Amino acid sequence: MPRPARGFTLIEQIAAIALSGAAAAAALPALAALQAQADATALQHLASAAGSAMALNYAGCLVSNQAAVPGKCQVMANCSQVGMLLQAGLPAGYRVLPQAMPAQAAGRDMSCQLLDNTTGAGASFRAYPTGA
């Protein structure tokens, strides 16, 4: 008595592998675009966090009459100091362009530039000079 055939033939397996490869090749450009979009979004969120940290520090400095008080008011004289205001610091792979913030400008906001070292993309955030 002949046994009924079980499983897949070699031709069916090759066809399935070829279709899987074609689907993967078609999806690859979409995944690359997704990575670029994720990098840009991460940069924007980090710039927003830096701006929020600067604004909170400025509010603490207003309460302490621009005197440095640990946990409330950090003296900010350069844009690149924003890392001290972020809880975990500035993440690896990002940097803030150094830009002096003169003490006489206290109370006026200015724009600082955050850069992604891997893509070269940049985003700006508002900074507030603080301290005596």
Where in the sequence are the language-model features?
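N-terminal single-pass transmembrane signal-anchor helix
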Residues: 1-35
